[in-house]
Amino acid sequence: METATRTHQQRKLISSFLDITVNQTVEIATQFLEATTWNLEDAINLFLIARRNPHHHHGEELVPLPLPSKKNTLYDYDPFMSHNTSVAVCPEEIWDDESTSEESDSRLSSLYRPPPSLFFHGSFEDAKATSSREDLWLLVNLQSTTEFASHLLNRDLWPHDAVFQAIKSSFILLQVYDDTSEGQKISTFYKIDSVPPVVLLIDPITGQKMRMWSGVIEPQGFLEDLMKYMDSGPHEHVASLTSNKRMKTEKISCSSNNADDQDMATFWGNAIEEEKTVIKSGKEETFTSDRVVAPSWGPEFEDIMTLSEHEEETCLSCDLLEFPVLTEEPKADCDRSVVCSICVRFPDGRRKQRKFLKSEPIQLLWSFCYSHMEESEKKEFKLVQAIPGASKTLDYGAKATFDQSGIANSMISVTWE
């Protein structure tokens, strides 16, 4: 059984090695992994060093095969069982390498190193306490050093501009590995059966798992899912649950008092019947209390009504505003370096996403929002950018581009004036 497990682990490491190095053979992958006692990171770095070595003769293989390592130990060493350690592994250390003097940005491994400033550095309990104290949702990323999808998450999801900003503003992100005691505790407690990578959204106050993603996660879909939790923090969520329970209790209490209310209604009905009188107007016209006599409000009330109508016209004056014509959205094959993506959240909860050229004026964002409003909603509105620790109201009169204004690849909320 133990031999079968080891063989399965080795096959996964070989597969990951081939995915990263590209166009290499199983034999080369096996030799490099064996030379580094089946350590994927060391094997890849050794492969890169060997490939860059200029001292090879014409006709020889481009990648020289490494010599197998030899070690003398006092006891049998099992590389797969030795990963059971209580020491947490920092995510940025997985791809760190001090075995070569080459610049980190020239190594293939630098592509798979996640942004260290995005992650919480500490234990799961510390992350939960900090999230609760700062009223932020807790995201837990369970990774695996042997699953290539985990490295893809570090390369494609966490460095994504919009995802990075969303997490910084409303979440705390903890990354742990499944071969540590911390990762195993989380897997057991939340009954995670999926193969890493797995991302959990946790209420830090109650510890409840609110949402889970697994496998290769696309940034756009992940961002849309996160935005559902950015309108309110965990404290407001718990307060709403408490409020719902209180409302149910009040309904039960109200139903028990219905009989008393009916008795009071009967009492007042009888009293009204007894006090029916004949009302005579100046023209001697007769009315009874069964008929409602409309009061005369006088000119003062008419002035107030006129003022209210004027205010309503002012609120709807946005209909007269002319926004610039919305340009055509950049195509998918457009150069990504000149394109930005904006996600807009409307007051009714709808979310729309659109791409703009970074060189285009930000006034087009008002045009985009206005085009997605119903006729009954078209009134004065403002656009607010959610940034960590504060919010920024955008200025329509500012003559700036998306790139100059700093709102490229961000989330914008529409609020009524």
Swiss-Prot record:
One GO BP: proteasome-mediated ubiquitin-dependent protein catabolic process
InterPro entries referenced in this protein's UniProt entry, alphabetically: Thioredoxin-like_sf (IPR036249), UAS (IPR006577), UBA-like_sf (IPR009060), Ubiquitin-like_domsf (IPR029071), UBX_dom (IPR001012), UBX_domain-protein (IPR050730)
Pfam families: Thioredoxin_7, UBA_4, UBX
GO cellular component: nucleus
Keywords: Ubl conjugation pathway
SUPFAM superfamilies, A to Z: Thioredoxin-like, UBA-like, Ubiquitin-like
Gene3D superfamilies: DNA helicase RuvA subunit, C-terminal domain, Glutaredoxin, Phosphatidylinositol 3-kinase Catalytic Subunit, Chain A, domain 1
Coiled coil: none
Domain UBX: residue ranges: 335-415
MF GO annotations: ubiquitin binding
Name used for this protein in its record: Putative plant UBX domain-containing protein 14
Originating gene: PUX14
